[in-house]
Amino acid sequence: MALADSARGLPNGGGGGGGSGSSSSSAEPPLFPDIVELNVGGQVYVTRRCTVVSVPDSLLWRMFTQQQPQELARDSKGRFFLDRDGFFFRYILDYLRDLQLVLPDYFPERSRLQREAEYFELPELVRRLGAPQQPGPGPPPPHSRRGVHKEGSLGDELLPLGYAEPEPQEGASAGAPSPTLELASRSPSGGAAGPLLTPSQSLDGSRRSGYITIGYRGSYTIGRDAQADAKFRRVARITVCGKTSLAKEVFGDTLNESRDPDRPPERYTSRYYLKFNFLEQAFDKLSESGFHMVACSSTGTCAFASSTDQSEDKIWTSYTEYVFCRE
C-alpha cells in the first residue's frame, strides 16, 4: 500500500492516471502570452491579446485563436510579424480597443486606411470609413503664416495671405461675382495669376507641419589644384533628421531605416539616411511635399598633414545641413 500511495503522487505513476491527466490539461499555460508584441512593417506595437482578438472572425482573431504560435511569422527578436503599413496600423489597433473610429482632423488617406481594414477583415470599420463625410459647422481654421484657409471652397484650397474672404455686403445681388474670386484671379503684382496653389507656396489642411533637416559630409578643393583640375562634389551619404512619419511621407522607399528600424511614427530620429547621393533629388522630393528651406549651415575642416602643402582635396572636408519647414 505504501508503494501505491507513493506512486499515486508521482507525475508518471500509476493508480491515479485519470485524475492527473485532467489536472495537467487544465494547468497547461495558454498558447499566446497576455502581452503581445507585434512588428507591423517595421513599427513595433505592444498590446494585450484580448485587444487583438476583440473582433471575432477577423484576421487577427484567427491568428491568435485558431493558430499555434510557431505557425506565425516572427522577426529576429521573436515578435509576431505582419507585412503591412505600420503607420496605419495604429488606427486599426485603436479601433480594436473600444470599437470606435477616431481620426484626426484633415485625414487625407481614408481610402488607404479602408484598404488596411479590408485586409484585417473588419467589416464595421470598412463601412464607417466608406461612409460620406459630413462637414462640421465649426468656424474656419485659424490663419497660417503662408495663407488663409477658405472654408467650403472647392478642394479646401488656401488663399494667399492678404486675400481673405471679405464679409458679404448688404444689398449685394445673389448673381454678383464674389470679390474673393476677383482677388484670387489677380496676382499681387497686378498681372494674370497662374495656378492658385502649388505645394511650395501654401499647404492644404491635410498636411502635417514640421521640420526636416538633411545633411551630408563631403570634400572640396582649395589651393592651386582648384584651378588646374576640377574636382567634382563628393557626397558619401545624405542623412535625414526629424519626425519619423514626416520623413517616411516625403522620401518613401528611398529612406533607409536600418539604423533605427523600431522608431514609432510620432517620435524623432537622427539616424535615417537616403538610398541615393544626389542633393537635388532630395530637394525635389521636399519641394513636392510642400517643404521650403528656412536655414542652412556649413563648416570646413582641415585634417592634420605632415607636409605644409594643404592643397590636396582629400585633406579638406566639410559638413553641410539644410533645414526645411512645412506649415
Swiss-Prot record:
The modification Phosphotyrosine is found at Y119. One of its GO terms (molecular function) is G protein-coupled neurotransmitter receptor activity involved in regulation of presynaptic membrane potential. Transmembrane segments: none annotated. GO terms for cellular component: cell projection; GABA-ergic synapse; postsynaptic membrane; presynaptic active zone membrane; presynaptic membrane; receptor complex. It is found in: Presynaptic cell membrane; Postsynaptic cell membrane. GO terms for biological process: protein homooligomerization; regulation of G protein-coupled receptor signaling pathway. It comes from the Eukaryota. The keyword Phosphoprotein applies. SUPFAM superfamilies: POZ domain. The keyword Glycoprotein does not apply. Expressed in the brain, mainly in the hippocampus and cerebellum. Residues 11-21 have a biased composition (Gly residues). Keywords: Acetylation, Cell membrane, Cell projection, Membrane, Phosphoprotein, Postsynaptic cell membrane, Synapse. SMART domains: BTB. Auxiliary subunit of GABA-B receptors that determine the pharmacology and kinetics of the receptor response. Increases agonist potency and markedly alter the G-protein signaling of the receptors by accelerating onset and promoting desensitization. This is BTB/POZ domain-containing protein KCTD12. It comes from Mus musculus (Mouse).
